[in-house]
UniProtKB/Swiss-Prot annotation:
UniProt-listed CDD domains: ABC_MJ0796_LolCDE_FtsE
Organism phylogeny: Bacteria, Bacillati, Bacillota, Bacilli, Bacillales
GO cellular component terms listed in the entry, alphabetical order: plasma membrane
Domain spans labelled ABC transporter: 3-221
Keyword Nucleotide-binding in annotation: yes
Keywords, in A-Z order: ATP-binding, Cell membrane, Membrane, Nucleotide-binding, Translocase, Transport
Function field: Part of the ABC transporter complex hrt involved in hemin import. Responsible for energy coupling to the transport system.
Membrane-protein topology: Peripheral membrane protein
Enzyme Commission identifier(s): 7.6.2.-
Organism: Staphylococcus aureus (strain MRSA252)
Annotated protein name in UniProt: Putative hemin import ATP-binding protein HrtA
Endpoints of the signal sequence: none
Gene expressing this chain: hrtA
Length: 221
């Protein structure tokens, strides 16, 4: 299975005020592959990621998953749901009144897991990041790095088929950033997901299978 991006164009506005943000984007990402998107501010990275996540419609072009359109106008496809896409953002966006374990279990239950299944998976994921002793604390009791690790495991909670990450390490120091990207890569490889991450940090490029460079809405050679 692969994610295939064909001739994606995105314009904002109309007439004289129209801005062309994406200008014919083409690439493929295979199952189990971890790809980094890089480019200057305004190059179209976040717009592209938002389209891939089904949160924004392209002006023209097609995104295919397993040879079928990723989303139609109702944001549905034959074999992929919005729940099958995991998002990781620069900020953790944890729910302040939920304990760490609950941040994950609620995601699992919403995806159809039983309470027991959800709890078992959440504990295992939190063990993987060394937070098994923090299950019952609240977000304000966590460090910035711990919050981001919880947010990342939350994205993997329901075994998504695609992971989209937008600058998930921007607020972290070099050591923590490396650990976060290693963690993301490991999950993508182990679960054979499709992973796409935006980052400006060239030190992290070595963890990607491939780096796609965007400039002025186009992929550079």
């Amino acid at each position: 299975m692969a994610l295939v991006v064909k001739d994606i164009v995105k314009n904002f506005g109309e007439g004289l005020s129209e801005t062309k943000v994406l200008k014919g984007i083409n690439f493929e990402v295979e199952q189990g592959e971890f790809v980094i998107l890089n480019g200057a501010s305004g190059s179209g990275k976040t717009t592209l990621l938002t389209i891939l996540g089904g949160l924004l419609s392209q002006t023209s072009g097609t995104v295919l998953y397993n040879d079928a359109p990723l989303f139609d106008k109702q944001h549905r496809s034959s074999d992929l749901r919005l729940e099958d896409i995991g998002f990781i953002f620069q900020s953790s966006h944890l729910v302040p009144y939920l304990k760490v374990i609950e941040q994950l279990t609620l995601v699992g239950q919403e995806a159809g897991m039983t309470k027991q299944q959800s709890s078992k998976r959440a504990i295992q994921l939190l063990k993987n990041i060394g937070l098994e002793d923090r299950l019952n604390v609240y977000p304000h009791q966590l460090s910035g790095g711990e919050k981001q690790r919880v947010a990342i495991m939350r994205a993997f909670m329901n075994n998504p088929k695609i992971i989209l990450a937008d600058e998930p390490t921007a607020s972290l120091d070099a050591d923590r950033a490396t650990k976060v990207v290693e963690m993301i890569r490991q999950q993508i490889k182990e679960q054979q997901m499709i992973g796409i991450m935006i980052t400006h940090d060239r030190r992290l490029f070595e963890y990607a299978d491939r780096v796609i460079e965007l400039e002025d809405g186009k992929i550079t050679d």
